[in-house]
Curated annotation (Swiss-Prot):
Stored InterPro entries: Ribosomal_uL10, Ribosomal_uL10-like_sf, Ribosomal_uL10_bac, Ribosomal_uL10_bac_type, Ribosomal_uL10_CS_bac
Cleaved signal peptide residues: none
One GO cellular component term noted in the UniProt record for this chain: cytosolic large ribosomal subunit
Family statement drawn from the similarity comment of this UniProt entry: Belongs to the universal ribosomal protein uL10 family.
MF annotations from Gene Ontology: large ribosomal subunit rRNA binding; structural constituent of ribosome
Database matches in NCBIfam families: PRK00099.1-1 (NF000955)
Gene expressing this chain: rplJ
Keywords, alphabetical: Ribonucleoprotein, Ribosomal protein, RNA-binding, rRNA-binding
Protein name: Large ribosomal subunit protein uL10
Source species of the chain: Pseudomonas aeruginosa (strain ATCC 15692 / DSM 22644 / CIP 104116 / JCM 14847 / LMG 12228 / 1C / PRS 101 / PAO1)
Annotated function: Forms part of the ribosomal stalk, playing a central role in the interaction of the ribosome with GTP-bound translation factors.
Gene3D superfamilies in the cross-refs: 3.30.70.1730, 6.10.250.2350
Length: 166
């Protein structure tokens, strides 16, 4: 089915805007995945602030041109499903990784983060990045641990001085 030039320009502009606003991108091949499963994937992605779209490769190459995601141009072969993470860099990678576990035919091709190409076997690195809330929680636990250790040390010094004075 042929797409009119105006429609192609609109698709390129839409995907380009999504790419400019995104923190990371993940590319997958969704051949053979049922419509119901894809609908579930899109719903989950929407809830996580991830933009998901199936785009023709030539249009996708034009859309990511000049963005940090043009490193993905070599993997735009065959049916391409692209996901841009807008709120957290690992969101799309996590969603795709979990979805791939239940779908035999769903294949993650690659990802890009901060202009760096990540092969399919490196997706776990991106997916394992902590969310903002998780990172703050980890930082607070480190600070709390250091504060507790300092308080115990000061109490031990005080007790030692009191024992020496008595």
């Amino acid at each position: 089915m042929a797409i009119k030039l105006e429609d192609k320009k609109a698709i390129v502009a839409e995907v380009n805007e999504a790419a400019k606003a995104a923190l990371s991108a993940v590319v997958a091949d969704a051949r053979g995945v049922t419509v119901g499963a894809m609908t579930g994937l899109r719903k989950e992605a929407r809830e996580a602030g991830v933009y998901v779209k199936v785009v023709r490769n030539t249009l996708l190459k034009r859309a990511v041109e000049g963005t940090q995601f043009d490193v993905l141009n070599d993997v735009f072969k065959g049916p391409t499903l692209i996901a841009f993470s807008n709120e957290h860099p690992g969101a799309a990678a996590r969603i795709f990784r979990e979805f791939a576990k239940g779908q035999d035919k769903f294949e993650i091709k690659a990802a890009a983060f901060e202009g760096q190409f990540l092969a399919a076997n490196q997706i776990d690195v991106l997916a394992s990045l902590p969310t903002y809330d998780e990172a703050v929680s980890q930082l607070m636990s480190v600070i709390q641990g250091a504060t507790s250790k300092l308080a115990r040390t000061l109490a031990a010094i005080r007790d030692q001085k009191e024992a020496a004075a008595a």
